[in-house]
UniProtKB/Swiss-Prot annotation:
Family of this protein: Belongs to the MON2 family.
Keywords, comma-separated and alphabetical: Protein transport, Transport
Keyword check for Transport: yes
Protein name in the entry: Protein MON2 homolog
Organism (species): Caenorhabditis briggsae
Function text: May be required for traffic between late Golgi and early endosomes.
Cross-referenced SUPFAM superfamilies: ARM repeat
InterPro entries per record: ARM-type_fold, DCB_dom, Mon2/Sec7/BIG1-like_HUS, Mon2_C
GO BP term, pick one: protein transport
Length: 1645
């Protein structure tokens, strides 16, 4: 401490004044004092003069301290009062200005000790000692001890003034000693220096060597104080003879309270506490045997039984017990408050001792005294935290905090137990209640409440000046416990709050440990506090006291919320809840919410004391009465029971609502309990929610189960409760997401219960729905958290049977939706609008019309008011809401459908340009739904019109939105149209098909190739599937509807058939127009195959219209717009240099698809033919099948007069259409197919079967042949198909050449139709003319043309080995035998003539090749013989035939004989013998028997030319007789046989004629006989002429000579006929030539 200039000058002047005064007073008797004083004056003056500056002056004065003290000490030694006073004054100045040195301090101390011994100026000595000790650290050790001892001794002086001053001085000195320790620690703030002892054990009379001087002094002082209190002699304070125990305890208390840092910083002092103080306190607590037991429990106790027995007895034990006990309790309180960290075990013992005092109050003041101490302890947050950490958190330690709480609770319960109840108590109870004082009432026991009690304001602990305990008022203990419990609750909450505050620098492990400590503190105190508070609250009769207890309960709830103690918090909330309701069992009895079950023994008391009460004390005012809120989980009998609500219930209700509002974030799973309590409160107080979710007082309806009566006194509370309840919703709205959802769940659960009650027809509470609506309306900023769950619940309520609740929920949901759309939230506006509108969409599942109408009203309102603000993603949901009206569950109510369609039109008209393009797909789907609804067909048709309008809009938007977006919408549009194409209503289907075709036609080119993949597989193919399925399953029954329909559409079958026709036609056009895009598909092959499959099915379907349409679609999809009249038959011949016209017109198609199309063509053709054959089989007028080998007449040139019911026959138009496809199709696949496809079993068989399809009678009149070819279109198409195949087979290098014979066979089949025999009952198609006439115009031309083509094909390709080796020539010759046999019986004579010419062509072509391959064609010769025989000798004669015609026919026969003679007989050696013999026989027969008796012209009765030809052939064969050496013997034998046969025949004819002529007499023989003999004579004449040309035929010569007699025999008969006579004369004259032969060769025979 520095001294400024003014102070130093004043000090010098004061010292000089004191010395002068001392010199004056001592000059009479104390001369040595006078001299010394004068010397001091001189010394001071010299120092003052010599010192420059104040600092130097002070330093010099301190250096001369001893000299300055000398006169003052001498004055004190004189014991003269005045001199002593002056000297002590001077010493005080030196001490005050710190001029005194250490030696000077010792001198002063010794002199003061002497004065005390002399009892001189004791008061002034007491004034000097404290400054001396406290000024500087110059008084230490024994010097300091002397100072302290002096004050202690003066404390026991006789003068009261001295005693009081000494008492103050003692306290000051003791405090100064410990303050010096603090100063010393501050100076040496570094680590304490440990002084190693010199050796041996430290002396018990000295301080530990590790302490610094000041600390050592304090150590010795404190230790001696303990010794003095314990009645032992001090070791440092030598000279103290006596000291009262109360003073010692007070000094200990002051030191322990004032300087805790000293005891904590220095372990030596801590050891003093453990070794001296604590055992001392324990002994003083129990000076009897019990104290021995307690003392022995302390491990550090140094007090022995002997020391206890040696303690001098004081005054009466009972009298001195209270002041000492009171001070001991104060010290114990201090030890626990300040030294708990170093005295764990001791503090535990002290608290246990206090609890023992509380448990057993034998003197009346021990329990309140201990309660006051415990109250101070548990009011400290730090101490509560310490007890929790040190004891309760340790597993094997005593739970001190828990014991304290339990003991307080036990005291409360004991105080509320009434052991006896007398009339005096009854009177006192009445007086107390009349006085209106606060108190507690339990079962007739009245306990008053002492007000204004705090932990610091105590009665017994503050009685330091009293020897006896003051009188304790009744109810003090219970009141103290009540306040202590409240303070304990606050302390526990403070501890929890401190531990739960997150420290940014705190590690994770530390945070978890803090939370664990907080949980233990709460768990160990909550049950006891709750039990006590619950009991006190139940018994309280004062509003203020009840409010304090409710506040405590609320704090307990707050603490539980902070630590997350769910079970404990549950019990606390439950207690507060039942306090708010009419009875403790109300929740369990009327709400079905049982009290939480105790999980430990200490919790049982809660149930026993609070929950099990039948009713609350009846002192509170009744505010309301009525029935409880109905709950479905309890018996319905309880719904009509009357309950009472009191003012204390309302007070608790206010706290309850305020508490849950305050701690709303931590209630977690207790929200159901809280909301149920609020619901019952609102019900009991008739608080009804308004439409906006707020509460107000209303009167219950008359029809309810007993009205609720509310007193006027409760109206104010109801208003406050309404206000508090209204604040719950905003508080809930501010909750975090998870907690908010818990509240929502609880409200939904309560709402479900209300729904269950409403289902019984009873009035139910609207509280849950109101609060839920209110909460959600205030939480729209966090809509993403709750919306889904809340909306689902409202939707559930909307589906309830209660009309009012249903309507209320619908209004709530739609109102929330309207506000939610406009709310500003953290959500993405897109997601927000989607979520809100999705909830409106969920209402679509509600079948109630009113709910749906409110839904539509809401949507319409949104569009009208906020339509421009709707985001792109919201429009699809809006549209879907409108479209969802079309649903079976609602029965498609007409008003809803119309209202919904108005909304749809509003979107399409007002928002089509503004809504995002990606919403158009949803709009299209919505419109499609309305087009499918069955309620109003006009709306359906109008909806399809909207689709067409939207398609134009899409097309206009393509450039701005891009191909991807537009294609996506196109897909939806096409899908919807395709779905409408299979609508059950024909008008809708037709309109949809037209719209689909128009849309694709107008805008289909907008799609890119990838999009077509989706169109094909997801739209077109499924559409075709559905149409096919419906067409198959459609009913054939006529419609009985009200509308009059045309006969062509009067059945579902007919309607679906037309739909199928439209669909196939439309899709075919799509395939053609979009061929380029479709070809870009990777799976175009599969697409093509699938579509052709549908065409195949439709073409073969048993419906003429559908079949023909499918065939035309098939033609169109293959050939484009090319006409069937422009087909190029000879495409191969005209495609050498440039591409043909067909190729330029036909759509592009890969080769694989052409092959697939070829296969489909075959299948369709077979199917059509198969249907025609089936019709023939089922025909009721089928012709009898021919037994011959000729084909039947059932062909495309025949007809069916009648068909069996349901039998379908493809018409000529079907066959013609499919055949017109063949040429271009075959041109594409000719290079890819195999020869097996052209074999007779494949393509020719198909063509043949198609030719066999009959013509329906109704179509026959319209089948007209061509004016040029005389063929019907079908026949032309068939022959053109064959020609196409033939041309392909004749191309050089082709592999199909082996199929030529099969094509010829097919043509022969066609040609055979002209040889069929006509039955008498055969009717021409249409029945207009005879069948023969019909055949002449429709059958014969086709057959003859087929035959010509066949012969042409054969003659042109016979040089091919594949054709010649196939033996097709045999088939042709065999076939030609039939018309040649029929000859004049054929339908047309041109047929057999064509056959004859064809035969000759075939013979000319095939015989030369056959001669070269005799083995291969072995059967050819017999076939030729058969055919010739059938032709030349047919029994079928013409009835009328002109001579020239017969000559022409005979000429043809001669030509055939000529071919046989030149091609066969000329090479007879190469032919089989039997076939040659047969030929000779035929010639023989032809040469003599060719007579036609039916000829009217006698001059031409014989076929002379034929006979000549036969004779010439026979005669030519006779050349073999002269072959001899030149040719083989076989030929010679053949000539001899021929001649012999001829001559024998002539001899027999002449002999028979002569014989018959003689026998006939005058009768003339038949003309045939005359002609026969004429032929024989002619043959002889021919032989003679032959012999004349070749005289070497000796055998013939002999035979002719032998025949001459027979010729002569004819002469008598020649007069019968002139012609015969002339021929006979000619023959006889020929013999002249024979006889005149000059050189007759000799016969070798």
């Amino acid at each position: 401490m520095s001294i400024n200039a003014v102070d130093s000058k004043k000090l010098v002047e004061a010292l000089l004044g004191d010395l002068r005064l001392l010199s004056q007073e001592a000059k009479k008797k104390q001369n040595h004092v006078k001299e010394s004083a004068e010397t001091g004056v001189v010394r001071i003056r010299n120092i003052s003069t010599a010192s420059v500056g104040d600092t130097v002056l002070i330093t010099n004065l301190r250096a001369a301290c001893t000299e300055l003290l000398h006169p003052l000490v001498l004055a004190c030694e004189t014991r003269h009062t005045r001199l002593v006073q002056i000297a002590l004054q001077g010493i005080q100045r030196l001490v005050q200005h710190r001029i005194l040195s250490g030696n000077g301090a010792t001198i002063v101390t010794n002199e003061l000790w002497a004065l005390v011994e002399a009892e001189c100026e004791e008061l002034r000595v007491l004034q000097t000692v404290p400054p001396l000790v406290s000024s500087e650290l110059i008084v230490t050790g024994n010097t300091l001890a002397k100072c302290v001892v002096m004050c202690f001794r003066l404390h026991f002086a006789k003068d009261p003034i001295v005693i009081n001053a000494a008492s103050a001085a003692v306290r000051q000195l003791v405090s100064t000693v410990f303050e010096r320790v603090i100063q010393e620690d501050g100076i040496f703030s570094s680590e304490l220096t440990v002084v190693n002892p010199s050796g041996g054990r430290p002396s018990p009379r000295a301080a530990p060597p590790t302490l610094r001087p000041c600390a050592a002094d304090a150590y010795m002082l404190f230790k001696d104080l303990c010794l003095l209190i314990n009645g032992e002699a001090p070791t440092w304070l030598v000279g103290i003879q006596e000291m009262t125990r109360t003073l010692g305890l007070e000094l200990l208390e002051s030191l322990l309270k004032g300087y805790p840092s000293v005891f904590i910083r220095h372990t030596e002092f801590g050891d003093l506490l453990k070794d001296d103080v604590c055992p001392l306190i324990i002994r003083l607590f129990s000076p009897n045997v019990k104290a021995m037991h307690i003392n022995s429990q302390h491990p550090s106790s140094r007090i022995s039984n002997a020391s206890m027995s040696n303690y001098p007895p004081t005054v009466s034990h009972d009298r001195q017990s209270f002041p000492i006990s009171m001070r001991l309790v104060r010290i114990v309180t201090l030890l626990v408050q300040f030294y708990q960290n170093i005295l764990h075990t001791e503090c535990e013992i002290f608290i246990s001792t206090l609890l023992k005092f509380v448990d057993g109050d034998r003197k009346g003041w021990q329990r309140p005294l201990a309660l006051e101490s415990l109250h101070r302890i548990i009011s400290s947050t730090d101490l509560v935290k310490w007890m929790t950490e040190s004891f309760d958190c340790r597993p094997n330690s005593t739970h001190v905090l828990e014991q304290v709480a339990v003991e307080l609770s036990v005291v409360v319960q004991q105080c509320l137990v009434c052991t006896t109840f007398s009339s005096d108590q009854d009177n006192e109870l009445d007086r107390s209640q009349e006085d209106g004082g606060p108190g507690f009432l339990v079962k007739g026991l009245w306990v008053p409440y002492v007000e204004h009690l705090t932990s610091k304001k105590t009665i017994l602990l503050d009685s330091l000046d009293r020897m006896d305990a003051v009188a304790i008022s009744e109810g003090y203990v219970l009141s103290r416990c009540c306040v202590a419990l409240c303070d304990l609750t606050q302390a526990v909450y403070a501890v929890i709050d401190r531990l739960c505050v997150l420290d940014e620098n705190c590690e994770a492990g530390s945070s978890e440990e803090n939370l664990r400590i907080a949980k233990v503190a709460y768990a160990n105190t909550q049950p006891s506090i709750l039990a006590a508070i619950g009991s006190l609250l139940a018994a309280s009769t004062d509003e203020i006291v009840s409010d304090q207890l409710l506040c405590c309960l609320s704090t307990l709830i707050s603490a539980g919320c902070r630590v997350g103690a769910d079970q404990d918090l549950h019990r606390s909330v439950y207690v507060l809840a039942i306090m708010s309701l009419p009875s403790p069992s109300y929740l369990n009895q009327f709400a079905g919410i049982p009290p939480p079950s105790p999980v430990s023994k200490r919790e049982v008391s809660i149930s026993e004391q609070v929950f099990d009460l039948e009713s609350w004390p009846s002192t509170a005012q009744v505010t309301a009465t009525g029935p409880p809120c109905p709950c479905p989980v309890v018996s319905t009998d309880l719904w009509n029971k009357q309950v009472l609500l009191t003012s204390k219930n309302l007070q608790a209700a206010r706290t309850f609502i305020a508490s849950i509002t305050t701690h709303i974030k931590e209630l977690n799973g207790l929200w159901y309990l809280c909301m149920a309590t609020c619901e019952h409160l609102s019900w009991l107080l008739a608080m009804r929610p308004t439409q906006i979710g707020q509460f107000e007082r209303e009167t219950r309806d008359d029809h309810s189960n007993g009205p609720t009566v509310v007193t006027n006194a409760a109206l104010g509370d109801i208003g406050m409760l309404s206000s508090l309840m209204d604040k719950v919703a905003p508080a809930i709205a501010a909750l975090p997401n998870e907690e908010f959802l818990l509240v929502v769940d609880a409200l939904i659960r309560l709402s479900d219960e209300s729904l269950a009650v409403a289902a019984t027809g009873r009035d139910s509470s609207l509280f849950p729905l109101a609060v839920l609506y209110r909460v959600c309306s205030l939480s729209l900023s966090g809509i993403n958290v709750f919306w889904a769950k809340v909306a689902n619940h409202f939707i559930k309520v909307c589906n309830h049977t209660s009309v009012s609740m249903r309507d209320w929920a619908a209004v709530a949901l739609t109102s929330l939706a309207k506000h939610a759309i406009k709310s500003k939230t953290s959500m993405d506006p897109k997601s927000q609008q989607e979520m809100v509108i999705a909830s409106l969409l969920a209402l679509c599942s509600i079948p109630h019309i009113q709910v749906r109408r409110r839904q539509l009203d809401c949507v319409m309102s949104l569009m009208q008011t906020d339509g421009s603000s709707l985001l792109s993603t919201s429009w699809p949901n809006v549209i879907q809401i409108i479209s969802s009206i079309i649903d079976n569950d609602t029965g498609c109510e007409l008003s809803l459908v119309r209202q919904g369609y108005l909304g749809l039109r509003l979107v399409s008209s007002d928002f089509l340009q503004s809504i995002p393009f990606d919403c158009i797909s949803g709009l299209v789907e919505a419109i499609s739904r309305y087009s499918k609804q069955n309620t109003d067909q006009n709306i359906s048709l109008s909806a399809l019109t909207l689709l067409w309008t939207i398609s134009d809009f899409i097309y206009r938007k393509m450039e701005s939105v891009g191909n991807d977006a537009s294609e996506a919408v196109w897909m939806v549009l096409y899908t919807c149209l395709s779905e409408s194409c299979v609508d059950t209503r024909f008008a809708v289907r037709k309109s949809a098909c037209q719209t689909l075709l128009q849309t694709v036609t107008a805008h289909g080119h907008a799609l890119r190739a990838p999009a077509w993949h989706h169109v094909i597989w997801q739209i077109i193919i499924p559409l075709l599937d559905k149409v096919r399925s419906q067409t198959r399953c459609a009913s054939t029954e006529k419609s009985n509807g009200e509308l009059i329909m045309h006969h062509s559409r009067d059945t579902e079958q007919k309607q679906w058939t037309e739909t199928c026709i439209h669909t196939l036609s439309a899709i075919s056009k799509i395939f053609n127009s979009q061929r380029k895009s479709l070809l870009a598909l990777n799976d175009f092959g599969a697409v093509w195959e699938a579509f052709l499959g549908y065409l195949d099915w439709a073409a073969c379907y048993e419906n003429a219209e559908l079949s023909l349409s499918a065939i035309r679609s098939y033609q169109e999809v293959l050939l484009g717009k090319i006409s069937s009249q422009t087909l190029n038959v000879n495409s191969h011949e005209k495609s050498n240099g440039s591409e043909s016209t067909l190729d330029t017109v036909a759509p592009e198609l890969p080769q694989a698809q052409w092959v697939e199309s070829w296969k489909v063509w075959l299948r369709i053709s077979r199917g059509l033919a198969r249907q025609g054959c089936a019709a023939v089989a089922n025909s009721v007028n089928a012709d009898t099948k021919s037994t011959s080998s000729t084909p039947r007449m059932n062909s495309s040139t025949s007809s069916l007069t009648s068909l069996a019911p349901g039998v379908y026959v493809p018409g000529p138009s079907h066959l013609t259409a499919i055949l017109h496809i063949f040429p271009p199709l075959f041109d594409k696949v000719a290079k890819c197919i195999t020869v097996d496809d052209l074999k007779y079993e494949s393509l020719p068989a198909v063509l043949e079967s198609m030719m066999n399809v009959p013509i329906p009678s109704e179509q026959a009149p319209f089948v007209l042949p061509s004016s040029t070819t005389h063929l019907t279109p079908t026949q032309e198409a068939l022959l053109e198909a064959v020609k196409i195949v033939y041309v392909e087979c004749t191309i050089s290098g082709t592999t199909l050449r082996t199929a030529i014979p099969d094509q010829i066979r097919l043509l022969l089949k066609f040609a055979s139709m002209a040889t069929q025999r006509i039955s008498p009952n055969k009717v021409a198609p249409g029945g207009q003319k005879s069948y023969r006439d019909y055949a002449l115009t429709a059958i014969v031309p086709f057959s003859e043309y087929s035959l010509r083509i066949a012969i042409e094909f054969f003659t042109s390709t016979s040089q091919y080995p594949d054709v010649s080796n196939s033996l097709i020539a045999i088939n042709i010759i065999k076939f030609l035998g039939e018309p040649l046999y029929m000859k004049y019986t054929c339908i047309s004579a041109s047929t057999w003539k064509l056959a004859a010419s064809s035969l000759m062509s075939v013979l000319r072509t095939s015989i030369p090749y056959a001669r070269q391959n005799p083995e291969v064609f072995r059967s050819l010769w017999s076939t030729i013989c058969d055919t010739m025989e059938r032709w030349l000798f047919t029994p079928n004669k013409s009835s009328r035939l002109a001579a020239d015609e017969r000559k022409r026919d005979e000429l043809m026969e001669c030509q055939a004989i000529e071919i046989i003679r030149n091609e066969m007989l000329a090479y007879a050696s190469r032919l089989p013998q039997e076939d040659v013999q047969r030929l000779i026989s035929l010639l023989h027969r032809g040469s003599i028997s060719q007579i036609d008796s039916t000829d009217v012209l006698d001059s031409h009765t014989q076929r002379n030319e034929l006979a000549k030809a036969c004779f010439d052939a026979l005669l030519m064969s006779t050349d073999g007789a002269q072959a001899g050496a030149e040719e083989d013997d076989h030929r010679g034998i053949l000539g001899n046989v021929a001649v012999t046969s001829l001559l024998q025949r002539c001899t027999q004819v002449m002999a028979d004629f002569c014989k018959d002529w003689s026998a006939a007499g005058d009768l003339r023989l038949p003309r045939s006989r005359i002609l026969e003999i004429i032929s024989a004579l002619q043959a002889i004449d021919s032989l003679i002429a032959r012999l004349a040309r070749d005289p070497r035929m000796t055998e013939l010569y002999s035979q002719l000579v032998s025949l001459f007699p027979s010729v002569v025999d004819v002469m008598p008969c020649c007069h019968a006929d002139g012609q015969l006579e002339q021929q006979l004369i000619k023959t006889i004259k020929s013999y002249q030539t024979l006889f005149l032969l000059q050189n007759i060769p000799q016969s070798t025979v």
